[in-house]
Amino acid sequence: MRVCIVNEFFYPDDTGGTGMVLSELTAALRHDYPSVQIDVITSVNLYRDQAARLSVYEEWENTRIFRLQTPQAGFRTTRHRLMANAKFGMAALRKLRTLGRYDLVLIGTAPPTLAAAASAYKRLTKTPYLYVVYDLDPDRAVRMGVLPARSPITRLLRSWQKSWMQKADQVLVLGRCMQEYVTRQYGLPPEHVQVIPIGGDHEAIRPLSPCTRFRAAHNLNGFVVCYSGNFGRYHDFDTVLDAAKCLLGTEPTVKFVLVGGGAQKAHIERRVRDEDISNVMVLPFVPKEEYSDLLASADVSLVTLEPGMEGLCVPSKFYSILASGRPTVATVSAHSEVARVLAEEDCGLQMVQGDIVGLVGALSHLLHHPEEAARMGYNARKALEEKYTNRHVAALYYQTMCRAAGCVAFPAKQSLSPTRVPPNGVLRFASPGNAEKSTPAAATAVLPD
């Protein structure tokens, strides 16, 4: 089966987002299903580096990568982003037509114009396409106040979005909340919209010892609450900062570490400085190879979303937190995918956005009940290994791809191994330079994230 994946960003971009997610999916597919021949059409740009340019062609993981020399949408004006997105979509369509016939095209939503390219390519060649909705626009732009809800451009974009979804052979979304939203708002039959989670890398991200290099480098002691990832406008940071202010006087051992960058970084830094929230530390992104060490540095990891964003996206960082074997505290609505997994797997606590008292209470509870935090962390890793590894996700994609392309599905090269988390509630922490250590789930100083 010949498959072409089209996305603006791809390997070696390792700064998160759809490029990194699709790179990991491609590697997992090529490893377990070598009969799948994959080409990738992407850009020469890196997501967080405006100046860097990659080579126009590369081979990686037995995959051909074709990079288009198109302008980067970046973080400029809405008009500039729309024009850059349109140029990439048109260039991708031209490239598709020069590469020969494929059995299937797989596209994401970076940029949203890719669906137009895939739809046109299907019309010209009868090639089916899978439409993976990572972030749903224009709905997300409307919720963030970028586009007026009833403007002519919004209505036009919604009509296009509905057409692209209808023409796709399958729409793939990241969670049940997204499936419910898409079927309701765009009138699609439930069987046309399939849920496949993002998944996490259970090999690169492990339940490491709490004695991390990150903690040592930043002199972090006590109970560490960590947020790592994009400081985007659709994340609820004010609730986190308000909770930090409340805990400043009552729980002096609690430290908040916010690692990343994005649209809200200046706002966060301004509040921390002006309001003297001294228990909050704001740090830049860490390299990918240090990410597992970062996640192991916290006793609790945070997931946030602004109200109304459920159904439009699912934070990918959540699955990395599961892989780290740490509990999650999430300020999200109860019907979001994150909240559902937390409840189903008993691997964290959820409160609605703006619930400062609830967030303070949740963090204080886990601070004073480390055995419960340890149990939740154990459950998190167990859930990841049983349901949400990259290999599990690749298997779901492979079956869907074969159905859409009308190809015979072959077994994976290696069967999916059962969970390596032992059934006795013991996680094995890997410590750099030392032998692995068994830590009972009931111990009092375990599972710091």
Which role does the model predict for each range below?
Residues 53, 183-184, 190-192, 199-216, ...:
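Acidic anion/phosphate-binding donor-loop and adjacent secondary structure
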Residues 358, 365, 372-387:
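A short, well-ordered alpha-helix in the C-terminal region of glycosyltransferases
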Residues 44, 177, 199:
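Carbohydrate-associated surface elements
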Residues 116, 120-124, 151-171:
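Membrane-proximal helix-turn-helix segments that form the acceptor-binding/catalytic region
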Residues 1-61, 247, 425-430, 443-449:
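N-terminal subdomain of nucleotide-sugar transferases
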Residues 259-260, 265-292:
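Nucleotide-activated donor-binding/catalytic signature segment of Leloir-type glycosyltransferases, i.e.
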Residues 235, 287-296, 301-322, 327-340:
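Nucleotide-sugar-dependent
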Residues 217-235, 241-244:
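Conserved donor-binding/catalytic core segment of Leloir-type glycosyltransferases
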